[in-house]
Amino acid sequence: MANDRLRALEDVEKEIALVLQSAGTIVLELSKEKANASLLDRQLNQFQTSINRVESELSSQIRYLTQVATGQPHEGSTYSARKDCQMALNRAEYARVKLGELGRTCEMMLDPQT
């Protein structure tokens, strides 16, 4: 799934290159005294098609990122479970240390000779 998303972003990058190429060709053609109308039409269509593809794919990527960034565990991810487990272990260790301190304090109070 992640590889598919990366490939889609690589395709978007290629489409952006096509957008820039089409825009450059259009500007170059418009700078001529007599512009080739059919070339301008073809490049404009290519430009618009590429822009629409880029917009569509980026919107899809943003929707996906919005879904996975809502705090819900991502399908296939164990990060949340591992983090919860680690935090529980930390709390247990903290409780063990505090109980040890409490035990030593109680012993000192019950046995004032030490």
UniProtKB/Swiss-Prot annotation:
Gene source species: Danio rerio
Identification of the protein by name: Mediator of RNA polymerase II transcription subunit 11
Chain segments annotated as transmembrane: none
Coiled coil residues, start to end: 28-61
Keywords: Activator, Coiled coil, Nucleus, Transcription, Transcription regulation
Family as reported in the entry's similarity comment: Belongs to the Mediator complex subunit 11 family.
GO-annotated molecular function: transcription coregulator activity
Subunit structure: Component of the Mediator complex.
Domain of life (superkingdom): Eukaryota
CC per GO annotation: mediator complex
Organs and tissues of expression: Ubiquitously expressed at early stage of development. After fertilization expressed in head region as well as in lateral line primordium.
Compartments in which it is found: Nucleus
Function noted in UniProt: Component of the Mediator complex, a coactivator involved in the regulated transcription of nearly all RNA polymerase II-dependent genes. Mediator functions as a bridge to convey information from gene-specific regulatory proteins to the basal RNA polymerase II transcription machinery. Mediator is recruited to promoters by direct interactions with regulatory proteins and serves as a scaffold for the assembly of a functional pre-initiation complex with RNA polymerase II and the general transcription factors.
GO biological process: regulation of transcription by RNA polymerase II
Record flagged with keyword Hydrolase: no
Gene inactivation effect: Knockout embryos do not show any morphologic abnormalities at early stage of development. Small eyes, small brain (microcephaly), and heart edema are observed in mutant animals after fertilization. Mutant fishes show also reduced response to sound stimulus, suggesting compromised hearing, and increased movement after light stimulus, indicating compromised brain function. Decreased survival is noticed compared to controls.
